[in-house]
Amino acid sequence: MNRILFHSLTIPPDQVSTGKLVADIASKFKEKNLNIKILASTPQYRFDSKSFSDNGLKKIGKNKYVSYYKNVEITHLSSSKRSFSRVKRFSQWINYHFKSIIYLTRNRKNFDTIFIFSYPPTMNLIAIFAKKILKKKTIYSIWELYPEIAQKLSELNSNILLNSFKKVDNFCLRTIDEVVVNSNEMKEYLINVRKINEEKITIIYHFANEKESPKSIEITKEIMYAGNLGTPQNVESFLDLFSLSKKQYKLTIYGSGSQYNSIFDRQSENITVNSFISRDELLQETKHIPFALVSLSPKITVEGFPGKTFDYLKMNKILIGYSNPKSSLANFIEKYKLGINISPNEDDLDSKLQILEDKDYIDQVYKNIKEINNKFANVDEVANQYIKLI
């Protein structure tokens, strides 16, 4: 039997949506009697390390823990709490990769196929190691494209580093067996710009393996945002535009990130900012809110697609995109008519919000959300697409 290993940075009980996606896919592999295990870090985003034992993590070595998610065994390599400093965060990645390489080398006879899920972008180093050194079938799932994002957001300004990283990334994508991307736009970019073989690229959308929540009873003038508050999300720019609106909508934010403090300082009668809360708490506190903001820097087009999009849809929220009209996000919202997309620095916000006051339009959007949840947010279908790559 083909022995399969999933390798991710985050995984439950850490409360990060991308980590839960990986775990849910793995659980479906397990249900189909596939030999599947997961290698990830200890919780580092939104989790108290002192309570590891209370949440199912059992220490089995100096820097190693084990837990189970729906009968899938997870090995956790010890990691410190996530830092918002770029230098410290990069150091955390490299430290994690070093521990991963040691683990993979020692356990190389225990798996045949490895699925590697990026973030962080330096996961490409592990993909190269798994294919070239360990000679394993390697499938790399890319959810964000680097160094393009770092370059566009001016997070990395050294041409030497940018070119070096791109060469390493291209070497990775040309060397491994299969590449998974989350949008057609990213696939086309890899083919036309990065010159990656089309035959090895598969499109698999993000999804949210959660029960669909009831829609809001009333269509009120309330918007929610839940997630990361960093540079790529561009939430501060949306607040600039939102503050000029005469529509008197209210925006409630839940999250954490490098821009949290500056966003928190912008609270007003119409803007409320809260720190991160669990998904169950979020559902309860936002069940009356009909709209959800998905914000993305206008510099990002094909390089990233916010995973929270599908989580919002499972929460039955009508999407308000704030992104480049040429972005994968904007194309997705408009193609499937799931709400509106606002072009940063160009569109008049109030004219777009006016669209959301049309009852017939809202009724149709809810029907479209239902269809998308059945089509793309089905974990069985997503898992089957991954299984076909083995």
Language-model segments: residues:
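N-terminal subdomain of nucleotide-sugar transferases
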Residues: M1-K62, D240-K246, D380
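Nucleotide-sugar-dependent
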Residues: Q233, S278-K287, A292-L313, I318-N331
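Conserved donor-binding/catalytic core segment of Leloir-type glycosyltransferases
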Residues: S216-Q233, L239-S243, T252
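Carbohydrate-associated surface elements
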Residues: E185, I204-F207
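Membrane-proximal helix-turn-helix segments that form the acceptor-binding/catalytic region
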Residues: T105, T122-L125, F129-I133, I160-V179
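Nucleotide-activated donor-binding/catalytic signature segment of Leloir-type glycosyltransferases, i.e.
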Residues: T220, Y260-T286
